[in-house]
Every structure is written in C-alpha cells, then in structure tokens.
Amino acid sequence: MVSRRNYAAITAVMVIIFFLFQFLNMAKDHWNDYSENQYAVDVNELSGADNVYVASDSDELDQQSTGLIPWAKKKCVVCIGSNESNTMGEMIGNWALYMKRKISYYESISAYENAISKKTQDTPQFVLVDPDFINWDDTKQIRSLQTCVENGISVIFGKLPDASIIESHKLLRRLLGIDEIVQESVTGNGIHLYSGFLLGGEAIYKADTDEEEKNQDMDLVFPWYHLTNGTKIYMKGMLEDSEIDVQKYPPLIWRKNFTTASVFAVIGDYMTDATGLGMLTAMLCEMQSYTVYPVVNAQNFIAANYPGMANENTAVLRQMYSQTMRGLFRDVVWPAFSSINIKTSFLLSSMMTMQFDYADAAKPNSDDVQYYMEAVNEEEGEMGYSVYSVSDTSVSEKLSEDEVFWKSTLPDYKFASFYVGESSDEEIQEALDSKFLQQIRTVVKGIDDTSDVIGYINNQVTKQNALIDGYEHTFRQNLRIRSVETALGYTSILADISRAAYPQSDEDGWEKLSEKLMANTITYWKPFSVFSGTTVSQSDSRIRRFLSLNYEEVANESNNKILIHASEGDETAWFVLRTNGEVISDVAGGTYEEIEDNVWLIGMEESSILITLKPSNTLFYYE
C-alpha cells in the first residue's frame, strides 16, 4: 500500500513532468519563428554575376612577402579541337572557370603552335585534345603533341581516335603508351574504377543480379589495348572470361609517364558532361606533388513540388494509398523526409506547390501551411516555391493565383528559392520579374547532363542544377556524383513528389519511391559526409563566394608548408587539399577535416592560411 507521503511525492513528480513537457512545447512553438524567411534578402545587395572571377593575364592579389618563394600565377590550360560550344570544349571551359584558370581554344594543333611561336600563348600546364577535330593523317600533328610533352606540357586525350587510326600510327601508340592492340572492339561485363583517382574510393560497376542489371548504363563495348611500362591505370573494363589475367583487362583511363610530363588517355564519352569536371581535377592532381583547389562545399536535398496545399486527385490517391493528398503528404511522405534528415547530413529544401491542378475545383487550404512551415523549420530546412503544375496553366496565371492565396495566409514570408524544373528561360525570367518572387536569390533547375552545374541565371540570381534523381541510382550516375564531388564538393539530389501525387503507374507509388530514395541517400553519399549539408539558399551563399573567389598559393616543399592567400568575402572560402602521402599537422587561419586518405577539406577563415604538412606514418608504394 502506498503511503500518503509517497503518493504526494509521485503526484508532485508527475505534475512537474507534465508542466515540463508543456513548457517545452510552448518554448518550441515560441522559438519556431516560421513566419519570416531568414534567407530572403535584397538580392541587389548580394554578390552578383559581375563579381564572378574569370582568370586573365593581369591577375594580381594584394600580396605580402611570404618568406617562402615568390607567388606564382596558376598555369593556363589549352583545348585543341573543341570550342566553347562543343560538349568537351564547354566542359573544360566550365572547369577552368571553377578552377580559376585561364583557358584558350584552338581549332587545330598547328594554330596552337603558331600562337606559341608568336608568344601570344603562355605555356599551359596541359593540353586537352578532342580527337574528333584532329587530322590524324597528318603525322606532323602527332609529332607536335610529342613536342608538347618534351617541353613539360602534359597532354590529355579527352577520348581516343578509332583503334584503326591508333594501329596505323606507331608514334601515336608510343605517345599513348599502347604496346599492343588486342582487339579493336570487345564487350565487357563491368567497369572497375580504382581508388585514389576520384573521391569516394574504389567502385565496381558490374551487375551481378537482375536488380543491379537495371543500374547498368555504362558503355561496355570498348577497344582492348595492352600498355607499355611506365603507365598507371585508373579505370579498366572487366571481362566475362575468368581465365584472362585481371592485370590484362582493357584499360579505359590511364596515364603514360615521360621524364618531362604525362599523357592521359580516356576511352569513352566521360569528358563531355559534368563527369569530366572531376576527371580533369583528378588528372591535375596526378600531375603535381600536391594540389589545392577551391570547392563549394554544399550538399543539397530537394523535395520538389512538396508540400501541396490543395486536396486534389482524390479518387486516384484513395485507390492507391487509401488517403487524400493531405493525408499522403502529412502522414506518409513527411516521415520519410524527417528520417533522411536524421540519418544523413542533408538539410531539406522543400519546394511548395500551392496547387497542382488549377483547372479543378480544389483550392489550397491555409490550415496546412502552419504545419508544414513549422515541420520544415524544426528540421532546419527551407521552404521554397515551385512553378510546377499539371494543368495547362500559364506561369503568369499560376503566380497570380498563388500570390492571392499566400498574401492571405503568410504575407510576411518571402520565398528565396525557386524550383523551375524544365521551364524555359523565358518562363523563368517572367516569374523572377514578378513582384511575388522579387526576393528569389537562387533557382533550382531540373536534372541536366550539362557540365554547367552552378552559375548565374541573371545578374543577381544564381542557378543550381539538380544532379541526380533520388529515386534511381545507375552506375553512370554514381560516376557522375563522384566526379562532381571531386571537382566541386557539391551535390544536389532531387525527389519530385509530383510522381507520388499524380502517379502514372504502380512504380510511382510512394512505397516504392521512398524505398529507393531512402536506400540511395543513406548509402551512396557516406564517403562525402565531411561536406556540409545545406539548404539551397545556404548553398547559394557558398556558390556566390566560390564563383567570386580569386586565390594564389605558394609552397616550400622542403619545409612542408603551403600558404594560400584569397580575395576577401563574407563567407568562408573552402578548398580541397590532395597530397602524395603527407598529412596535415596544422592549419593556421583555418580549419581542416580529412575526407579520405591524402585528401582534406580546408576552411579558410582569414584572408591567408598557412598549412603545415608532415610525413605520414603509413607505408606507401609508389609506381
């Protein structure tokens, strides 16, 4: 039997616990100020397209004496064959912009040689060759590439000419490090990416199950070469025949070392889209004893067309989910997003569509706005705006209706981010010109194969391309993710909820979509968890800093010190440092965190930072 004293004590404890819970809920509601958007600012006060740094001959920073060696300008790069409008030429142009390098284009090797002889072209660090624009019948052009290597200029073949051309030119085979052409074409059953080239480690792109076969979108038909001594393979094809020595598998990406420079070869079309950004960066790192380069450091997760504020498509949703759209979004979809937020470093950028169908009778309900705004805010996410609709409604009509609803519901909240999907440039600009969206600072575009991953859509508004569909993860997409993470420290996952809201088949059911989404986001980005999870507006701030950044570096390798001096900015400047076995012992003026072996993320908190390295205790075997 409980005594009166114990009963009173138990009652008092229960009352205290009750009021504590009540107080916590009240405090949470009080502190959760969702009525105003912290990211919505006057975009004219932000760094704009006019501030983007483009490398030139006269680049100079406000330099001070280093006590090491004189500051040296970053070497330029050259593209032969492709121009800015070709896919490979466009890719290296974007790479040069992101890496703060000056780039020159030449239609032929002879045009490049002419510029060198007239001294109108500085000696580049490397030359990227697009073989589609080279006359291989002219052996003088091959000798010219050999001369480049002899003069200390590395040569990158963005892809290789046909095996028949290579077979007919002994000098070209010697330049590429090809000893024997085994077969002009062979069909493999997978591709092996070695560790230490792209960030993310080793990868085997081979389908061992029927389910994995759905992910196999790599080109598995390639020529088969045997290489000479002095070559290093970064990626190779895999063959079905188990009797073939693995060391003799067909190489797909490799380097041939010469005394003065290197020649890199790529088989396939990997250098024509964003995948090429990371591959060029990895090759640059292979040319140098250490490499420091700027990155964005932003990882985005975008829930496009979520939430919706109108109860639409009810008959279809009841049949598939036994739910209305309101129930689907609140009770089924939201828990999945909350779980991703907990289990990963991603922050949620939710792109609201107030209505999907403007032709039906359903209208948006203001009662749900508070729920979603509070929920997203509690997860430290951001609520943006989507222009998407399923009805034949013009952009101006949609904006007009949405503005009326929003002004009567949450008038003080101004949208700062804008999901445009596949909208045309004219439609995007029409929306940005509207009063309703006057504080938009960044636009999120749909998934595109272009290498133009980030940039400006107009003078004051940035653009961020979605890189990957969260509901699928093919082998080629995985390679693309690794490449963009290597080059930019950036990713952008897109989960379009309109598929679940307006399903076209059972494959669009949320149960199947969420299963894939959870597996993909939790699994494939683990190697890149050091990079920061951001909302798209936070990412926007980092993109502006990244694009406006100018920096210079100087090193005294005998003392294992690297000094970096950068242009000033409101945001932290982020860099990746890759070494050949050394590890960081100290960073004065900044922070550092290891991404993987020999790779660090550097945060630059002052205008100059000094990195001190030391030998690693790990044994390394050099080729």
Give residue spans per PLM region.
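A glycine-centered loop/beta-turn motif at secondary-structure junctions
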Residues: 75, 123, 215-298
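Metal-dependent polysaccharide deacetylase catalytic core of the NodB/CE4 family, i.e.
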Residues: 77-81, 149-151, 157-180, 308-311, ...
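Helical hinge/lid and interdomain linker segments adjacent to catalytic or ligand-binding clefts
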Residues: 81-163
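A glycine-rich, often tryptophan-bearing local segment used as a flexible ligand/cofactor-contacting loop or short
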Residues: 136-207
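C-terminal beta-strand-rich structural cap/linker in extracellular carbohydrate-active enzymes
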Residues: 139-140, 596-623
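Surface-exposed beta-strand/loop patches in extracellular or lumenal glycoproteins
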Residues: 214-224, 562-583
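Active-site beta->alpha N-cap acidic-glycine motif
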Residues: 268-375
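Catalytic grooves of carbohydrate-active enzymes
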Residues: 268-269, 290-310, 341, 409-413, ...
